[in-house]
């Protein structure tokens, strides 16, 4: 083949690819309102978890027990992790700014462990979940008031 023929074939292939219709990839994983609310999000990604499932649970002051609202989020996370068996996660426990660094590191770890233990009880393999505590070092909300403190008392699940 000569260069003109190769060039013409390459142009034809490029033209054919440009004219093809893009069809969304369907996996059967996302349905209903979640699918409509989050177009373009890759199923099984951190953005999918955050947008369609929820990535964090909140705790009361000086507590590490999972509240009812947190159980709802963790139930959705367990179901999502069941769909995406190849996905591993890290749960980061966080605290508000009150208390010593040492105390908040320990409390954040108890919060991360509580979320992990709940997911494991729901059937997620413990080997897929790691935990870490950031104590008060990674606030979600800035401020020294109850609204900010409530947002910072959390455990955040991240895809790893």
Predicted regions and their residues:
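Sec-dependent N-terminal signal peptides
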Residues: 7-13
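Periplasmic OmpA-like peptidoglycan-binding domain that tethers envelope proteins to the cell wall
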Residues: 94-160
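Periplasmic peptidoglycan-binding/tethering modules of Gram-negative envelope proteins
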Residues: 20-88
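C-terminal motif of bacterial Sec signal peptides marking the signal peptidase cleavage site
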Residues: 15-18
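A generic local structural motif
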Residues: 1, 75-76, 143
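Short, contiguous strand/loop micro-motifs
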Residues: 3, 64-65, 102-103
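Bacterial N-terminal signal peptides that target proteins for export
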Residues: 1-7
């Amino acid at each position: 083949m000569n260069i003109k023929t190769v060039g013409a074939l390459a142009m034809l292939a490029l033209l054919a690819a440009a004219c093809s219709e893009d069809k969304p990839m369907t996996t059967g994983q996302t349905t209903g309102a979640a699918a409509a609310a989050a177009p373009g999000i890759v199923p099984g990604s951190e953005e999918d978890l955050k947008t369609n499932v929820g990535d964090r649970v909140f705790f009361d002051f000086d507590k590490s027990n999972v509240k009812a609202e947190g159980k709802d989020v963790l139930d959705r996370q367990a179901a999502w992790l069941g769909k995406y068996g190849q996905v591993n996660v890290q749960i980061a426990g966080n605290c508000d700014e009150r208390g010593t660094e040492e105390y908040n590191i320990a409390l954040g770890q108890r919060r991360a462990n509580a979320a992990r233990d709940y997911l494991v009880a729901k059937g997620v393999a413990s080997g897929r979940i790691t935990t870490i505590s950031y104590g008060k070092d990674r606030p979600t909300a800035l401020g020294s008031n109850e609204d900010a403190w409530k947002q910072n008392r959390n455990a955040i699940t991240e895809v790893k």
